[in-house]
Amino acid sequence: LLRASVLLVLVAAACATPEPQPITYGVDQCDYCRMTITDERYGAELVTRTGLVRRFDSPECLAAYTHEHPEEEVHSRWVTDFRRPPRLIRVEEAYFLHSPNLRSPMGLNLTAFGEAIEQEAVLNSFGGEILSWDGVLGLVGREWIESGTGPSMHGPGAMPAHAH
């Protein structure tokens, strides 16, 4: 009976749907730029099909990682809802504000929001432009990947001057 119970637990765990995990701010390290994740309004995660969770300190690091690792078997990508931290939302359901008046940890000034109804208020408060996840991928591709000015995965020493 004990063996059957253990086997059942193992099978259930193996069949579990991969999902995001809480980010431990001040402890977890960004899987892209290697900085410690400190701002609870900007954390992001990538969950693989096998359940591995990769953590990021900003939407732009998640997008850059996505560009540089197209082979990753992704189950889902998540970003923190700026107005409701530490709530994680799927990137497909989020909208992103690109505004110099709302600085993100890596300096590309991308902030995720979860409620579409808030778009007008957010634009009125901060200015800028609203992007979809595809828009974020395009922006990061142009600003960091193609230009070669984004942080590399080789640590903080390779970070651009505008990042902090």
Where are these regions (language model features)?
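Mid-length scaffold segments of soluble, non-membrane domains
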Residues: 55, 59-88
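Histidine-centered metal-binding segments
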Residues: 151-164
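Thiol/selenol-based redox catalytic cores and closely related redox-interacting motifs
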Residues: 75-147
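C-terminal motif of bacterial Sec signal peptides marking the signal peptidase cleavage site
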Residues: 11-14
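Sec-dependent signal peptide recognition
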Residues: 1-8
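Post-signal-peptide N-terminal segment of Sec-exported extracytoplasmic proteins
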Residues: 26-68
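Bacterial signal peptide processing site
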Residues: 16-18
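Residue-level marker of regulatory loop/turn positions in helix-turn-helix DNA-binding domains and
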Residues: 22
